[in-house]
Amino acid sequence: MLSKEKIARINELANKAKVEELSAKEKVEQQELRKEYLEAFRGGMRHHIEGMKVVDQEGTDVTPEKLKKIQREKGLHNRK
């Protein structure tokens, strides 16, 4: 997760860009912060999805095999 300060800085640069042009240094900073934000977001989303177990209405595990394989590798949901 990104720190509150970094998220605030992302928003600050975005708002400034709407009003005036960012300097070259600010544009580079904005790109780096956005990249870091996306990496954190994608990592969190991947972690969330990898922890899911999908079941149908009868309670049968219908988790996709690709996800089951990842869960086995990570030792999640007692997959063997």
UniProtKB/Swiss-Prot annotation:
Main location: cytoplasm
Segments for region (Disordered): 60-80
Composition bias type Basic and acidic residues, residue spans: 63-80
UniProt GO cellular component terms: cytoplasm
Subcellular location: Cytoplasm
Keyword terms, alphabetized: Cytoplasm
InterPro entries: DUF896 (IPR009242)
Lineage: superkingdom: Bacteria
Coiled-coil ranges from the UniProt annotation: none
Family: Belongs to the UPF0291 family.
PANTHER family: UPF0291 PROTEIN CBO2609/CLC_2481, UPF0291 PROTEIN YNZC
HAMAP family noted in UniProt: UPF0291 (MF_01103)
Protein name per the record: UPF0291 protein EF_1580
Lineage: Bacteria, Bacillati, Bacillota, Bacilli, Lactobacillales
